[in-house]
Amino acid sequence: MNKSDALVVFSGGQDSTTCLFWAKKHFRKVYALSFIYGQKHVKEVELARVIAGKAGVEFKAMDVSFIGNLGKNSLTDTTITMDEVKPADSFPNTFVPGRNLFFLSIAAVYARELGINHIVTGVSQTDFSGYPDCRDAFIKSLNVTLNLAMDEQFVLHTPLMWIDKAETWALADELGVLDLIRHETLTCYNGVQGDGCGHCPACKLRREGLEKYLEIKAEREKR
């Protein structure tokens, strides 16, 4: 395994783009892997391809559309209206069951073919929106499972695991890509690039984080 290269699970959204540039800072060569999983807004994959090109990163998209057929959710089913608020007794219907499990398992197989043991993902327990497959315990458990399954020494990196959205924007600024991430990524559940629709849960979380970070930055610059 090549310990100086890394594979980034890359959607073209705020978090994974931040992780892409974080990986470029920490590893010699970086590869980006995107997934077509039946999402309504598949244009995110094309935007991911463009961003990867600007970053000088080798890009690959894999079709795993079966994931979208396994369970009902509002990201893949056009007949389901998206939850704007997380239900008190269940996951929000933007949760795609098994998505990160499949993504990271497939990424590990692909990384093995590339001779890579470092895999980077943008999951965060701080801003995990109630998704169980964004938790640190899940990542650590899967890391062990993948190593046992393939007799390898994979390392799953989660640079955003313990930081909130404001701190994620701060990291993007530190990496010199705040403007790129603000204007060129697609985080919006309604498929609107950049600042997004402003109404869906992803846009609200992203906007609140940006506003908080810009306030902190402005206060710091006054000192």
Curated annotation (Swiss-Prot):
- Top-level taxon of origin: Bacteria
Q: Which Gene3D superfamilies match?
A: HUPs
Instruction: Write out the residues that bind Zn(2+).
Output: C188, C197, C200, C203
Query: Which InterPro entries does the protein's record reference?
Result: QueC, Rossmann-like_a/b/a_fold
Q: State its cofactor.
A: Zn(2+)
Which Pfam family, giving just one, matches this sequence? QueC
According to the record, cofactor stoichiometry and binding are noted as: Binds 1 zinc ion per subunit.
Sorted alphabetically, the keyword list is: ATP-binding, Ligase, Metal-binding, Nucleotide-binding, Queuosine biosynthesis, Zinc
Which reaction is the catalytic activity of this chain? 7-carboxy-7-deazaguanine + NH4(+) + ATP = 7-cyano-7-deazaguanine + ADP + phosphate + H2O + H(+)
So, what pathway does this thing act in? Purine metabolism; 7-cyano-7-deazaguanine biosynthesis
A molecular function (GO) term: ATP binding
For whether the record's keyword set contains Metal-binding, the answer is yes
BP terms from Gene Ontology: queuosine biosynthetic process
EC nos: 6.3.4.20
Function of the protein: Catalyzes the ATP-dependent conversion of 7-carboxy-7-deazaguanine (CDG) to 7-cyano-7-deazaguanine (preQ(0)).
Q: Which NCBIfam families match?
A: 7-cyano-7-deazaguanine synthase QueC (TIGR00364)
> PANTHER family recorded for this chain?
7-CYANO-7-DEAZAGUANINE SYNTHASE (PTHR42914:SF1)
Name the UniProt record assigns to this protein: 7-cyano-7-deazaguanine synthase
